[in-house]
Every structure is written in structure tokens, then in C-alpha cells.
């Protein structure tokens, strides 16, 4: 019974991965086509394209790990192989989280309205701030990789140079739990906190702007209010998805009887996989150009389908 549930869980994750590939691939394709057509690309589209690439990389890495765990569940992996697996997981997750945080930071600096001189200074240099934030994140990536490699070197020696590639094994679960502690509690929490901060500051900016409108007896929405609401709608979904992702990934760290159950671990992984896949759908729906293109593609597919079905019955 446990084996059947694990297979179902793996199947659901694979479906989520396929949806994520299509969603993020669509973002990359549309933005690249507009880039070629117009011979220029905006900063927000650069971030969106890079974010979509990082999500494709993350989902591909997760898919490879799942496939390998199913096909080769009882083989021994060497120190180098463990490091390669962990490096790709850390790197893909790092850029996925930090690029999403940079996107939120970009929206915040572009749309929020504060009279503070520091904010005004950063607002005028929004592109440099975003680039600097992304470059600074590479320092955290280096430290993260260094700490985890040191841990792997120390632990693999205790396991006589090899580790069983079996995620149902208590030894393997304990080994990867410490890696989750280092990656999630220390490093992934930084871009997560940045995203939450920009989201809260956007809400505060909208509240202040709304108060000013009431003082001037303006009841209708202006352009700035609409921009706030549009971005907040996208960011609310991102905050919810990232919070669920962070929560269920962090739950695998807890040392209790529930976390010794491999089925609960699989459930956490299934829920966590919703974030990189579901967020791509949110980004498509929140961007006017991407949404219109997506609806045009759906209309074209529907039109082709209505033409194809009668021909099929005529045969």
C-alpha cells in the first residue's frame, strides 16, 4: 500500500513538473519572440525570462532526482555524485527564489510611493539595485555550497565513502535533513523574507495613497491605485505559494515520529512542487502581454480542434 501511495505521489509531482515546464517555457518563448521582434527587452521581462529559465532548471533537476530514485533506489552513490546532485538542487532553487525576490523588489521600487530620501535614491536606480541584489546573492550561494560540501565530506567519511540512494532509508533521510536545515533555515529564508517585506511595504504604500485620495475627496481609482492593486494581486498568490513551499519544505526538518514516515515526506514534496509550477501560471495571468498571448493560443487551439473533430468523424 505504501508503495502505491509513493507511486501516486511521484506521478502527481511529475504532472506538476510538466505543467511547470509548459508554463515557464511559454514565458521564455513569448519574451524571446518579443525581444527578437522589437530588438530590445524591458527590465521586468529580463527578470521574468531569467526566472522562467531558473524554474525550468529547478524542475528538470527535481525530475531527474525523482527518476533516479525510482530507477536506482538501492544503489550506492559516491561523494562526488552526492555533491553534484546537491549542487544542482541548491543552485536551481537559489536562482528561483532570488529572481522571484528581485521581481518583487522591482515592482516595489517602481510602483510604491514614499517620500523617504533613501527610497527615492533607490527608486531612481532601480535597475542597479536589482542587479546588485542578484550579484550579492551569489555570495550566499557560495557560502551555502561551501557549508554543505563541508558537511557532505564529514558525513560521507562516516558512511565509508558511500551513501545509499534510497529516500526510504532512515540514514538517507537524516543525511538530507541536515542539508535542508542549512539550505532552508539559513539561506532560502533570506529571499523569502525579502519577498514578504516588499509585499508588506506595497500594502502600506497603497494604504497611504488611499488615505491621501480620501483627503482630497477622490473616490475613483487613479492610475497609481490600479497599478498597486494589479501588482498586489500577483504578489498575493506568490506570497501564498512561496509560504506553502517554505513551510512544507521546512516541515521535513522536524525530528518527530511523523517525519519518520516516508509517506508524509512524499506529501510535503508534492505540495512544495506546486510553487515553481503554479507561480508560472500566476506570472502569465498577471502580465498583460503574456495573458493576451496565452488566450490567443487557447483560441487558436480551440479553433483547430473544432475543425479537426468533424474531419475525424467523416472518416
Swiss-Prot record:
Subcellular location(s) per record: Membrane
Signal peptide span: none
Molecular function terms from GO: bitter taste receptor activity; G protein-coupled receptor activity
Glycan attachment positions: 170
Biological process terms in GO annotation: detection of chemical stimulus involved in sensory perception of bitter taste
Superkingdom per UniProt: Eukaryota
Residues in compartment: Extracellular: 1-9, 68-101, 150-185, 255-266
InterPro entries named among the record's database cross-references: TAS2R
Something else known: Several bitter taste receptors are expressed in a single taste receptor cell.
Family the entry assigns: Belongs to the G-protein coupled receptor T2R family.
Protein's recorded name: Taste receptor type 2 member 129
Originating gene: Tas2r129
Amino acid at each position: 500500500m505504501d508503495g502505491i501511495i509513493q507511486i501516486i505521489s511521484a506521478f502527481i509531482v511529475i504532472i506538476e513538473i510538466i505543467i511547470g515546464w509548459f508554463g515557464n517555457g511559454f514565458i521564455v518563448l513569448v519574451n524571446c519572440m518579443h525581444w527578437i521582434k522589437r530588438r530590445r527587452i524591458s527590465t521586468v521581462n529580463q527578470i521574468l525570462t531569467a526566472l522562467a529559465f531558473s524554474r525550468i532548471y529547478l524542475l528538470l533537476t527535481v525530475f531527474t532526482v525523482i527518476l533516479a530514485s525510482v530507477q536506482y533506489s538501492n544503489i550506492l552513490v559516491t561523494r562526488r555524485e552526492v555533491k553534484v546532485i546537491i549542487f544542482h538542487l541548491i543552485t536551481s532553487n537559489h536562482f528561483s527564489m532570488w529572481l522571484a525576490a528581485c521581481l518583487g523588489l522591482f515592482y516595489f521600487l517602481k510602483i510604491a510611493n514614499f517620500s523617504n530620501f533613501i527610497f527615492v535614491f533607490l527608486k531612481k536606480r532601480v535597475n542597479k539595485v536589482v542587479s546588485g541584489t542578484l550579484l550579492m546573492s551569489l555570495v550566499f550561494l557560495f557560502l551555502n555550497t561551501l557549508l554543505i560540501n563541508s558537511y557532505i565530506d564529514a558525513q560521507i567519511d562516516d558512511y565509508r565513502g558511500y551513501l545509499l540512494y534510497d529516500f526510504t532509508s532512515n540514514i538517507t533521510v537524516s543525511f538530507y535533513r541536515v542539508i535542508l536545515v542549512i539550505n532552508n533555515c539559513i539561506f532560502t529564508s533570506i529571499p523569502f523574507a525579502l519577498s514578504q517585506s516588499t509585499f508588506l511595504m506595497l500594502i502600506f504604500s497603497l494604504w497611504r495613497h488611499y488615505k491621501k485620495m480620501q483627503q482630497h475627496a477622490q473616490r475613483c481609482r487613479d492610475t497609481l491605485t490600479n497599478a498597486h492593486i494589479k501588482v498586489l494581486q500577483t504578489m498575493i498568490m506568490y506570497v501564498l505559494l512561496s509560504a506553502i513551499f517554505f513551510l512544507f519544505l521546512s516541515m521535513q526538518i522536524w525530528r518527530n515520529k511523523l517525519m519518520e514516515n516516508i509517506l508524509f515526506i512524499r506529501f510535503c514534496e508534492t505540495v512544495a512542487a506546486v510553487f515553481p509550477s503554479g507561480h508560472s501560471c500566476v506570472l502569465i495571468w498577471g502580465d498583460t502581454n503574456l495573458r493576451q498571448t496565452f488566450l490567443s493560443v487557447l483560441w487558436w487551439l480551440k479553433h483547430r480542434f473544432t475543425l479537426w473533430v468533424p474531419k475525424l468523424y467523416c472518416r
